[in-house]
């Protein structure tokens, strides 16, 4: 039997996941993180993107995170997300439209603030589309 630890993924609205997992993959403030059983204690910011959860027996789940905090303690990992949406609950058409609008804003931006905001919106839309794609593959 594979080693596991307890994971909680919580957003401001609801608890998205609570259970035993083999590992997770998430984008922290310093880059990609893979959290396995026995990981050293850690507290870091999470960038907008996805969390890949590998549950017991290898089943995968993908959740879009708009950002938040990751806390790793002995045998327990907690993700406090600003917003969390399961892959199957994301609207692909809406994400495609958000991506298109962000690309338009980038091409027509007239300043650093406009460009930075449009870039952030583009990153969110791309992350949502990636979560949708991976969720479809996992089904």
From Swiss-Prot:
Coiled-coil segments: none
Record keyword Oxidoreductase present: no
Gene Ontology, cellular component aspect: plasma membrane; proton-transporting ATP synthase complex
Keyword Transmembrane carried by entry: no
Alphabetized GO MF terms: ATP binding; proton-transporting ATP synthase activity, rotational mechanism
Membrane topology classification: Peripheral membrane protein
Pfam family, one: ATP-synt_DE_N
Keyword vocabulary terms for this entry: ATP synthesis, Cell inner membrane, Cell membrane, CF(1), Hydrogen ion transport, Ion transport, Membrane, Transport
Main localization category: membrane
Domain of life: Bacteria
Compartments where found: Cell inner membrane
Cross-referenced InterPro entries: ATP_F1_dsu/esu_C_sf, ATP_synth_F1_dsu/esu, ATP_synth_F1_dsu/esu_N, ATP_synth_F1_esu_C, ATPsynth_dsu/esu_N
NCBIfam families for this protein: ATP_synt_epsi, PRK00571.1-4
Self-association state and partner proteins as the record states: F-type ATPases have 2 components, CF(1) - the catalytic core - and CF(0) - the membrane proton channel. CF(1) has five subunits: alpha(3), beta(3), gamma(1), delta(1), epsilon(1). CF(0) has three main subunits: a, b and c.
Family label: Belongs to the ATPase epsilon chain family.
PANTHER family hit by this protein: ATP SYNTHASE DELTA/EPSILON CHAIN (PTHR13822), ATP SYNTHASE EPSILON CHAIN, CHLOROPLASTIC (PTHR13822:SF10)
Job description of the protein: Produces ATP from ADP in the presence of a proton gradient across the membrane.
Protein name as catalogued: ATP synthase epsilon chain
Native organism: Shigella boydii serotype 18 (strain CDC 3083-94 / BS512)
């Amino acid at each position: 039997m594979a080693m596991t630890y307890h994971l909680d993924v919580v957003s401001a609205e609801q608890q998205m996941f609570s259970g035993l997992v083999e590992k997770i993959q998430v984008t922290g403030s310093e880059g990609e993180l893979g959290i396995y059983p026995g990981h050293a204690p850690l507290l870091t910011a999470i960038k907008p993107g996805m969390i890949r959860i590998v549950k017991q027996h290898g089943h995968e789940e993908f959740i879009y995170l708009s950002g938040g905090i990751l806390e790793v303690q002995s045998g327990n990992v907690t993700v406090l997300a600003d917003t969390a949406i399961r892959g199957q609950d994301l609207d692909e058409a809406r994400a495609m439209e958000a991506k298109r609008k962000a690309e338009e804003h980038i091409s027509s931006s007239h300043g650093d603030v406009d460009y930075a905001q449009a870039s952030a919106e583009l990153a969110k839309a791309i992350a949502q589309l990636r979560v949708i794609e991976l969720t479809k593959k996992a089904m």
